[in-house]
Regions:
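Structured alpha/beta or helical-core interaction and ligand-binding surfaces enriched in interleaved
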Residues: 1-141, 147-165
């Protein structure tokens, strides 16, 4: 794996991502939404399929590890498995700035999802070809915010095709 996540500027993020908000309540108040529930494995598969649907060029994530203080980083490392520690070490070697916005990579999806579903570090995933924002995680449920019913149908089709939600 070359890059776990690919950093982007706040400016680029705001230009590309139209469904963004500061609090979950803002999302519920200002956007159409549906919630999907399932196992960690189901979410990983769902997000990988959604990534394929949108393409790498239309897939983003906020990942707040770089803004954690040293004590919180240490606690996080104590909570993750060996596989995720290796990924985190690769991330740390490459990214030292306080950036939180990244292009999502397919390889990072299991890592990001495990951190969210295990309530270690929450991330929000943004897709822009079929615009939606997936806020995670609330007791293994992920609210999906969207503008257009045709867009959300793409994601509901993925969920239904996976058959293990």
């Amino acid at each position: 794996m070359n890059e776990i996540l690919i950093p982007i500027s706040n400016k680029e993020f705001k230009e590309k991502v139209t469904i963004r908000f500061n609090s979950i309540n803002d999302g519920f108040n200002n956007y159409n939404n549906k919630t999907i529930e399932g196992t960690e494995e189901a979410f990983i598969s769902f997000l990988q399929e959604a990534f394929e649907l949108n393409g790498a060029e239309n897939s983003y994530v906020d990942f707040y590890y770089n803004v954690l203080n040293d004590e919180d980083k240490k606690k996080l490392k104590e909570l993750i498995n060996d596989e995720d520690k290796i990924l985190l070490e690769k991330f740390e070697k490459n990214y030292h700035e306080k950036n939180i916005y990244f292009k999502l990579t397919k390889e990072s999806i299991p890592f990001i999802t495990r951190l969210s579903t295990r309530e270690i570090l929450f991330s929000t995933i943004y897709f822009t070809k079929y615009p939606c924002t997936i806020w995670g995680n609330y007791n293994k449920s992920f609210p999906i915010f969207y503008h257009d019913n045709n867009d959300i149908q793409q994601y509901l089709n993925i969920k239904n095709e996976l058959q293990f939600f």
